[in-house]
Amino acid sequence: MPADIMEKNSSSPVAATPASVNTTPDKPKTASEHRKSSKPIMEKRRRARINESLSQLKTLILDALKKDSSRHSKLEKADILEMTVKHLRNLQRAQMTAALSTDPSVLGKYRAGFSECMNEVTRFLSTCEGVNTEVRTRLLGHLANCMTQINAMTYPGQAHPALQAPPPPPPSGPGGPQHAPFAPPPPLVPIPGGAAPPPGSAPCKLGSQAGEAAKVFGGFQVVPAPDGQFAFLIPNGAFAHSGPVIPVYTSNSGTSVGPNAVSPSSGSSLTADSMWRPWRN
């Protein structure tokens, strides 16, 4: 009998041990299950927020574009986002145009800032030894292309017609030569024609690259046109008449001066020998 009692007493703690082992991991399982059960609810709420925002965005963009909402009741989410991006870009362009209309120096400041940043990047890449050569070349080429596009930007034609590269000059009508009086400092550009040049002329310094930045010489700005030609931008106060621009076009045969600067007499035209060629200086 005592032996049986001892066996029962010795077996009871062993039998109780599995029960205690099974009860301890219940708390982590409960927390994990709680997170798993709450995840679909969180996802459902997130999708509901996205759909609500897209619905409001759809209403706003259709009102802004003045489109009938009944005809666009089944727009996809991607269509709503694309329409919004296009609308914001148009607003950005309109703001830039308005800024240029009120302050003509905005574009010049933007170009100067971009050029300064590009120079800083170039200096860093030239001194940094850990940059891959291919990456450096691609980055500098990309910045050069961006700089060319920025230099091709012009001011709005309605607000500042004098700041655009003018078209080729049309054939002038009959009449004597007309000269625009203006007096910036030398160097001088001789104006061809029968009469003597005016007291002062626009300083000229033509770049060899079409994408070269516009430069200012003696108060006059030289702007490269996309077709490889150049135009002088003359301030309005430097003219005695209404013509605000004296365009200078470069070509293989020579340089022609716009009609506001020289108007040949009837029955005569400027020959190639009478044209000023900058490469002969």
UniProtKB/Swiss-Prot annotation:
Bias (Low complexity): 10-21
Keyword set includes Cell inner membrane: no
Composition bias, Polar residues: 255-272
Gene Ontology MF term list: chromatin binding; DNA binding; DNA-binding transcription factor activity, RNA polymerase II-specific; DNA-binding transcription repressor activity; DNA-binding transcription repressor activity, RNA polymerase II-specific; E-box binding; histone deacetylase binding; HLH domain binding
SUPFAM superfamilies cross-referenced by the UniProt entry: HLH, helix-loop-helix DNA-binding domain, Orange domain-like
InterPro entries: bHLH_dom (IPR011598), HES_HEY (IPR050370), HLH_DNA-bd_sf (IPR036638), Orange_dom (IPR003650)
Keyword Nucleus: yes
Tissues and organs where the protein is expressed, per its UniProt entry: Present in all tissues examined but highest in epithelial cells and in mesoderm-derived tissues such as embryonal muscle cells.
Originating species: Rattus norvegicus
Positions of the Orange domain: 110-143
Motif annotated as WRPW motif, chain positions: 276-279
UniProt free text on domains: Has a particular type of basic domain (presence of a helix-interrupting proline) that binds to the N-box (CACNAG), rather than the canonical E-box (CANNTG). The C-terminal WRPW motif is a transcriptional repression domain necessary for the interaction with Groucho/TLE family members, transcriptional corepressors recruited to specific target DNA by Hairy-related proteins.
Region (Disordered): 1-44, 158-206, 255-281
Residue stretches making up the bHLH domain: 34-91
PROSITE patterns given in the database record: BHLH (PS50888), ORANGE (PS51054)
Gene name, Swiss-Prot/TrEMBL: Hes1
Keyword tags: DNA-binding, Nucleus, Repressor, Transcription, Transcription regulation
Composition-biased stretches (Pro residues): 164-174, 182-201
Assembly and binders: Interacts with SIRT1. Interacts weakly with TLE2. Interacts with HES6. Transcription repression requires formation of a complex with a corepressor protein of the Groucho/TLE family. Interacts (via WPRW motif) with TLE1. Interacts with an FA complex, composed of FANCA, FANCF, FANCG and FANCL, but not of FANCC, nor FANCE.
Pfam family, one: Hairy_orange
GO cellular component labels: chromatin; cytoplasm; nuclear matrix; nucleoplasm; nucleus; protein-containing complex
Protein name: Transcription factor HES-1
Localization: Nucleus
CDD domains registered for this protein in UniProt: bHLH-O_HES1_4
Known function: Transcriptional repressor of genes that require a bHLH protein for their transcription. May act as a negative regulator of myogenesis by inhibiting the functions of MYOD1 and ASH1. Binds DNA on N-box motifs: 5'-CACNAG-3' with high affinity and on E-box motifs: 5'-CANNTG-3' with low affinity. May play a role in a functional FA core complex response to DNA cross-link damage, being required for the stability and nuclear localization of FA core complex proteins, as well as for FANCD2 monoubiquitination in response to DNA damage.
A Gene Ontology biological process term: regulation of timing of neuron differentiation
Superkingdom per UniProt: Eukaryota
